[in-house]
């Protein structure tokens, strides 16, 4: 949309020039007055805008020549016309054919800069003259020159920067640190010391020739499956373990396949030989004796899963392959479960491999070992019981437990609500001179006369009696059975009888 002419002033122009800051008065601030008249005035001014003048300006500008229109908006003679630009571009293209691309870019850019500088100087002179007449036109012309003038030079500069970047991209070689190089070849082979290698360079590892055990490409798979089904079919003469059915799955009978290879893949001849030598075909793993099983388990304890050391030191009657096969059969049996419970064979992976972070198994092992190594508490000695008896005989006013540890002061005395009185429990042997429990003694075995003489404990006994009167209506607790199987009186009943008997004695004394 074309801008309105500078000469014609719009009706809203005067409103913008008269704008000022809104300064509320004291009455507005006191009464919290919100003046919304400014918004209403702006809406009214926007509604009163006359669009007919803008349409007339646009129609008049459409009939103007381009030179007058440019001078009207302040561009003057500095703006280049499209026709002149096309002519200069054609001349530049003809000159570029004779010279190199790099020189043409530099010279073209510098030449254009010179021409633009000349035109800028001439334009500035015209602007100074026109600025005296109309300052608004000069400001508009300067803004337009800043926008339009450097476009062509920036275009060529960006092209040169793109070319430089493309040259740098061609020379740039990215690092290949992210690639994983396969370490295959003579440079990656380990250097074995002289004393470790058992064989010489031209010496064979073993003297026997290789023997073909099975060729899967000679017979199709469906015929091989039919042959294995016929080989595993029972004749009805089997006894013992061999009479147990093996299921409907097809067993990979290596002995039968090897017989088929020896018969030159003749299925009938291979089946005839298998039926003739049934024991050799069915007993893939011979039975291990009890001594061999024990030696194998001892080898697992000593050497772990190093079957070479187990065969060399423990089970010399078997080969390494037989030891490996027996290990997988033995691991599925009940014998392995008993072995794992006794030795924790499958739970100490972190000892063999420190990198394993199985902390749960380690925590269980440590907790079990701590529980097993925990010693029982030592039994009480006779000195503890003798100390308690001597303290009772002396009649000292102190709260002493049955182990002989005393705590002085009324703050250490427990309340009757917290202590469950279940009779006298003394650890250790008791003497024959023990005083019987009667009405003049407290439930802990102390005489009430001695307790009342101490002023620190007098208020404690009175408070306990008041508490007992308030809570005497509670139901009695269940009786407890001691170690001899006899029923001992409950704490509440025992305590109730003792206190009630003591109150009865006090009433008799007051009557006297």
UniProtKB/Swiss-Prot annotation:
The protein's name in its UniProt record? Mesoderm induction early response protein 1
Annotated GO molecular function terms are:
histone deacetylase binding; transcription corepressor activity
Where are the Phosphoserine modifications? 10, 141, 160, 166, 367, 369, 377, 483, 488, 491
Q: Where is this cross-link: Glycyl lysine isopeptide (Lys-Gly) (interchain with G-Cter in SUMO2)?
A: 239, 420
Major subcellular location class: nucleus
Question: Which GO CC terms are listed, alphabetically?
Answer: nucleoplasm; transcription repressor complex
Which Pfam families does this UniProt record tie to the protein?
ELM2 (PF01448), MIER1_3_C (PF19426), Myb_DNA-binding (PF00249)
Record organism: Pongo abelii (Sumatran orangutan)
